[in-house]
């Protein structure tokens, strides 16, 4: 598994912030800028993947007919996972 795929969300986000700072700075060559941009895209995809994994695991516990029932949480602005 590539190193970036093992990163936690927080670590990937931190690396992404560093990439953005580097791109906003001065003195990068075109080639370096492209490399940072590509790394940033990979990190964004990884962060989205991690968020999607967590979103799929979030559940709301409801009490229906005396039984505890779970269903997936529907987040505003995101995909609806509710039943």
UniProtKB/Swiss-Prot annotation:
Cellular compartments per GO CC: cytosol; exodeoxyribonuclease VII complex
EC number: 3.1.11.6
Alphabetical keyword list: Cytoplasm, Exonuclease, Hydrolase, Nuclease
Catalytic activity, as annotated: Exonucleolytic cleavage in either 5'- to 3'- or 3'- to 5'-direction to yield nucleoside 5'-phosphates
Top EC class for this record: hydrolase
Chief site of localization: cytoplasm
Subcellular location: Cytoplasm
Transmembrane spans: none
GO molecular function terms attached to this record: exodeoxyribonuclease VII activity
GO annotation terms (biological process): DNA catabolic process
NCBIfam families assigned to the protein according to its UniProt record, in alphabetical order: xseB
Subunit structure as annotated in this protein's UniProt entry: Heterooligomer composed of large and small subunits.
HAMAP family: Exonuc_7_S
Similarity annotation: Belongs to the XseB family.
Function, as annotated: Bidirectionally degrades single-stranded DNA into large acid-insoluble oligonucleotides, which are then degraded further into small acid-soluble oligonucleotides.
Cited PANTHER family: EXODEOXYRIBONUCLEASE 7 SMALL SUBUNIT
Name listed for the protein in its UniProt record: Exodeoxyribonuclease 7 small subunit
Organism: Moorella thermoacetica (strain ATCC 39073 / JCM 9320)
Primary gene name: xseB
């Amino acid at each position: 598994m590539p190193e970036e795929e093992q990163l936690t969300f927080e670590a990937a986000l931190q690396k992404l912030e560093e990439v953005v700072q580097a791109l906003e700075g001065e003195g990068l060559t075109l080639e370096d800028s492209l490399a940072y941009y590509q790394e940033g895209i990979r990190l964004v995809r990884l962060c989205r993947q991690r968020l999607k994994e967590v979103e799929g695991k979030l559940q709301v516990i409801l009490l229906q007919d005396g039984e505890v029932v779970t269903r997936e949480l529907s987040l505003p602005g995101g995909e609806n996972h509710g039943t």
